[in-house]
Amino acid sequence: MKLILTVFSLLLCFLLPTSEALARPKIGLVLGGGGAAGIAHVGVLKVLEANHIPVDVIAGNSMGAVVGSLYASGMSVAEIEQVSKTLDWGKLFSDDTSHQLKSYQQKQQNADFFTVFESGVSKRGIKLSSGLIDGQKLIFELRRLLAPVAQISNFDRLPIPFRAVATDIHTGDAVVLKQGNLASAVRASMSIPGLFAPVTLDNRLLVDGLVSNNLPVDIARQMGADILIVSNIPPDNSRKLDTALDISLQSMDLLVRKTSEAQLASLTPQDILIQPPVGEVGRLDFTRVAETVALGEKGARTQLVALQRLAGSLSSDANQFATPAHPIDEVVKVASVQIENDSSLRESILRKALNIKPGDVLDNQRLQDGLNRVYTLGYFSLVDYKLTQLPSGDYGLKVIAKKATEGEHRVSVGFSLGDDFNGDTRYQAGVKYVQKGLTDSGTELRAQAVIGRRLLAEAEIYHPLGIDGTFVAPRAWYQEGDANSLDNAQQVAKIRAREARVQVDIGHPVGNSGEIRAGVFHQKTKPLPKDGTPIVADKTLTEAGVKLQYQADTLDSINFPTKGGQLTAAYTRGVTAMGSDNDFNRIELEADRVWSVHDKHRFIASGRAVATANNGAAVLDSGNNLETHALQTGHLVFSDNAPLIGNETVAGSVTYMRQVAEIPEIAKVHVGASVGVSQAWQQRDAVDLGGLRNSGTVFVGGETPIGPAFVGVRKTQGADHQAYFILGRDF
């Protein structure tokens, strides 16, 4: 019996932890909110890791929740630092979807000049979003970063147990987030009131935890922490209160200070408080990430003696405290797909966009792509998801598509201004109204009106015929605008053209970048000569017939693209039996291509050609653009900013552009130069490529809140040098 007890005792000595291990206190890490200044937490983690200090539980708020969740997911400090330095924070805090990811219809809608202001409207008036930013890009990025633990719904099962803090906006109570989707929890924790839209989780409307508990010391203690390491971002007491934003941020700092005082007072002598000296880093200053991380390290080193004392009291085995590795990704097989949709769109449209079916094997990239396609339908402010493991081991996917808070009636305003500093000042101002959801298939009414150098009144109904994307689009417009007409490449007639057109198209999308249309049209144009001898008869011209058109857009940006291109190819058949003055055939080609070299150097090649057969009348314009497209970018601007048009037209340009500076949070500044040629003829017999007119321009340009802005000098063959200024996207 004694022998058995002896052997059993020896086995216990080998199998059970030592008394030192059993007695090791649990270390809790508390990371407070602080906006961009909260990135200093990464520097604090670097010092903890360098001194082999383990972290057993983490509680964080706002930016502290972001950094804390990444660390809790198993990401190393080096990886977190790399992420913080390489993320485009400016894009994350914008809801504008990448131009490349939009459908062709959305690209067309967003390429006009109605960019100054947009809101929803209702019988009660203007309907604004519940936040300046809905946060769709942010939640996508959080999903990507936290993908390795996306299937873990209990935050105690993370490599390091974690809690995020948010605030119930109805009651003001702190809400501890300990289960669900980790990315959604973090997003809720950083929903700064007024800046980010609130997040609904478990039927509670949540905003940033700064309102109730910015420094969740008590939460870490509730998780069982014996010793706390607290990284607190102190308020900026030196901020100049010059602007409304300064006042708003100062008000939030005062609120944060009040909610943090009680938490700081609860710290014990064995707890360690770290306060990074980030006073000069603004709450929205994401351009100083590397500096902010270094300030976090600096703040942690002020407590280096206490940290090293803690490390020495725990264990001499550094490897024991290494950050847990990422969990191995599970193969997620989807057994069911539910869609929670509160918009007017029928569910089948969302399912087609999602493109995930029961039985599919799901990876994070495919899921994100599907959610993004649903978001870009244009009806939603946020598209989130939940994955729930079923008893079978497979997963149920639930997609939550939250309709846009501004509703389905949208109004947007546009404005542009141009000046040649020689008495020719032009402006355009307009309003656009879009009513979505006329039917559950996504029918839209689109109407717009513009005044200024060009007058326009237009209405279109866009009606999808099925979920495959086929649509019908009746359209009518009236417009007035300036144009040039050339005879034998010599004489210029300056014309004010009045145009009325009705058109009915049937079309189909070509992938995500293009569209093909076929339709019938009837157009009347009244040319009114302005200067010079007119070469078109002073009578109403009628064109009627059929038109086939293909358009594609693969640009990555509408104003300052770095890659991709645009293409328009159209065939028009004029038919006298349909009311046209002449039977004619016309082919139009227009293309742009962008190449980048070493990131900041770009080359843009543009060309346009029109060829017409069997038309004795002068052609004014067969599209919806009497003003020059080149005015939108300033690359190819002719003497009076009106396009050269005729039965036979050739134009081309090559542009070099380089980004030379960046004004933080405002604009990227570009310089560039362009050379081009163009000419138009009314008769094919008169075509002479030797008579092409040369032109050139140099410019400085950049983005502004209402569109691109350019200042430059242009030179056209036979004309003097001319300075010009353009603000906003022209129509």
Question: PLM ranges: what are they?
Answer:
Residues T6-P17:
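Bacterial N-terminal signal peptides
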Residues A21-N61, S69-V383, T388-Q389, K403-T405:
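Patatin-like phospholipase
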Residues A166-D168, K178, P276, N341-S343, ...:
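Flexible glycine-/small-residue-rich
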Residues S238, Q308-A325, Q523, G564-L567, ...:
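Acidic/histidine-enriched alpha-helical segments
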Residues Q365, G370, L382-L555, N625-G634, ...:
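Gram-negative/organellar outer-membrane beta-barrel architecture
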Residues T376, G396, E408-D420, E543-V669, ...:
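C-terminal outer-membrane beta-barrel translocator/porin domains of Gram-negative envelope proteins
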